[in-house]
């Protein structure tokens, strides 16, 4: 830390000299304006960027270091999430077709990423999205809407024995991944760029809350996919010679009840977040006890099923319970956020 003494001039003006190395780095000249931002913790931030221009960050990946395209894909996602605005893939030889195909998948799976330049030995990806145009609140609401419909349709597919609906639920998980990665990226940008935080009118602490909730919703989506996948397995089992799903009407009704309980906890937790309501969040946590008791009954029923389908029913009941537990986690995040803001 560079410690400097305050000077008083004219009896009322407080003057602080700037480090020469910093002024030189940012090409500060006499009479140039600089920005002073008061942070939430009372500290002052001095910046040469008075126009609030988004910081440009570049990342170069050499293909010789990433012979595995799956590893390269994960590194591209990491570069995207951590806020790089330009990503360049370079190679000493012609870039293989599988890498180019992977890049196309990457641009389809991310929001705002496009190929800006491309030749035989390099590919440059640019971020064309203005972060301020995608408020975190809107993205969370969209994630909630998609996941809620995934969960409802997964259970409906079980009741209706609808294989195509199962596949539709599974495909929607890609949308959730894209939105979660976007929120993760914006969270990193906000925490590293105070001007963006100011432009989006959101503190780093609030951005962290959005990120935590987004990550939890993404996990709830994974369990909706698990339900849909196991319903598919049940339907395939029924198509086998002499295959028959043996499940009582009572068990179907218990699945429906457990599903409605889990979905109610999810809705309540998200409503408490929108309303910043601690009591609503706490009520969601308390209601988890009833779902846990019903899950215990469902698990026992699944175990006693005398047919190959019992294992799939067990997976489905477990995922319903996990959806309720993750929804309860959202309520805890909401309480932490609300108390922290007081």
Where are these regions (language model features)?
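Cytosolic, long alpha-helical scaffolding segments
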Residues: 2-6, 11-13, 17-342
């Amino acid at each position: 830390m560079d410690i400097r003494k305050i000077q008083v001039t004219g009896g009322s003006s407080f003057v602080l000299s700037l480090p020469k190395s910093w002024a030189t780095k940012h090409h500060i000249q006499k009479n140039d304006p600089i920005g002073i931002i008061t942070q939430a913790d009372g500290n002052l931030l001095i910046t040469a960027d008075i126009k609030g221009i988004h910081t440009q960050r570049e990342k170069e990946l050499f293909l010789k270091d990433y012979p595995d395209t799956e590893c390269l894909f994960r590194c591209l996602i990491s570069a995207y999430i951590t806020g790089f605005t330009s990503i360049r893939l370079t190679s000493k030889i012609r870039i293989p077709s599988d890498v180019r195909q992977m890049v196309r998948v990457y641009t389809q799976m991310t929001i705002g990423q496009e190929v800006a330049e491309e030749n035989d030995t390099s590919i440059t990806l640019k971020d064309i999205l203005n972060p301020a145009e995608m408020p975190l609140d809107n993205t969370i609401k969209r994630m909630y809407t998609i996941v809620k419909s995934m969960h409802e349709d997964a259970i409906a597919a079980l009741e209706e024995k609808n294989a195509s609906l199962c596949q539709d639920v599974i495909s929607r998980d890609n949308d959730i991944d894209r939105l979660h990665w976007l929120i993760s990226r914006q969270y990193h940008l906000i925490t590293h760029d105070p001007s963006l935080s100011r432009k989006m009118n959101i503190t780093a602490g609030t951005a962290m809350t959005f990120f935590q909730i987004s990550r939890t919703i993404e996990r709830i989506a994974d369990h909706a996919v698990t339900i849909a996948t196991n319903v598919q397995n049940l339907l395939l089992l029924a198509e086998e010679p002499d295959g028959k799903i043996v499940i009582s009407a009572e068990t179907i009704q218990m699945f429906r009840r457990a599903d409605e309980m889990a979905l109610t906890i999810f809705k309540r937790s998200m409503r408490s977040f929108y309303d910043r309501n601690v009591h609503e969040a706490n009520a969601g946590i308390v209601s988890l006890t009833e779902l846990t008791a019903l899950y215990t009954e469902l698990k026992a029923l699944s175990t006693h099923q005398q047919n190959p389908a019992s294992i799939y029913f067990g997976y489905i009941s477990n995922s319903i319970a996990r959806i309720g537990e993750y929804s309860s986690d959202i309520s805890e995040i909401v309480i932490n956020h609300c108390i922290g803001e007081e």
